[in-house]
Amino acid sequence: MSCCGGNCGCGAGCKCVGCGGCKMYPDLSFSGETTTSEALVLGVAPSMNSQYEASGETFVAENDACKCGSDCKCNPCTCK
């Protein structure tokens, strides 16, 4: 059986996490009932280029190439 319809996400180390993917944001889910208004506040963080620019290294997200299969196992696990 798939994990919540295959809606799980790959986390650190190419391990599947968040197998409640279909209910990722429970406070914002639609339940068919009348509810009060909700606000989502987004912010912007300052750039940290100065620390890493001098190193000459490029960083790639750890789970960039991972995809979760229907059984909630990362497929393929090609994290770089």
Swiss-Prot record:
The keyword Lipoprotein does not apply. PANTHER family: METALLOTHIONEIN-LIKE PROTEIN, METALLOTHIONEIN-LIKE PROTEIN 2A. GO terms for molecular function: metal ion binding. Metallothioneins have a high content of cysteine residues that bind various heavy metals. Belongs to the metallothionein superfamily. Type 15 family. Keywords: Metal-binding, Metal-thiolate cluster. This is Metallothionein-like protein type 2, MT2-22.
